Amino acid sequence: ELGLKLAKEKNADLVLATDPDADRLGVYVKDTKSGEYIPLTGNMSGSLLCDYVLSQKQAAGKIPADGEVVKSIVTTNLVDAVAKHYGCKLVEVLTGFKYIGQQILKEETTGKGTYMFGMEESYGCLIGTYARDKDAISATAALCEAAAYYKEKGMTLWDAMVAMYEKYGSVSYTHLRAHETSAHLV
């Protein structure tokens, strides 16, 4: 609440917060049309970062033919479309960032595949191979860089998110609790 209050007072473009061990990043982005701050889910912020990071790597000619984007099986399919757009193979792993870390190690030890980006829906992503766990510090830096990049183009991060949906298609999310819905699923 305090962060949003300060953001409104300062007319900030975004609000960022990490958890105490700085491995998850929470994001609010400003919608300039309504003036409201919109919370991004982990799927949204991760997909937005993936698209931005890969677009910058592509512009620099740094996406190898064996580039891979890694996600957990519960992560949005939006990132599948992002990976495909940039010519990267999508690798799905079990839930838990340790499996993304294991995929990085596998790529390094076998020489097959080059890690480009990894994410899971629970607000975690990893931009490089310097770690084997999610990292909100590098995600914060990259998201701020993305915000500046889009601002130069006259866009907010929310505008960039909307543009992603227009480019790749929108995705909806529903969390089901088995004990509440099992009768309806039969």
Task: Name each model-derived stretch.
Residues 182, 186:
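A glycine-rich beta-turn/hairpin centered on an aromatic-Pro dipeptide
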Residues 1-167:
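Phosphate-binding chemistry for phosphorylated carbohydrates and sugar-nucleotides
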Residues 174-181:
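Conserved small/polar residues in nucleotide/adenosyl-binding loops
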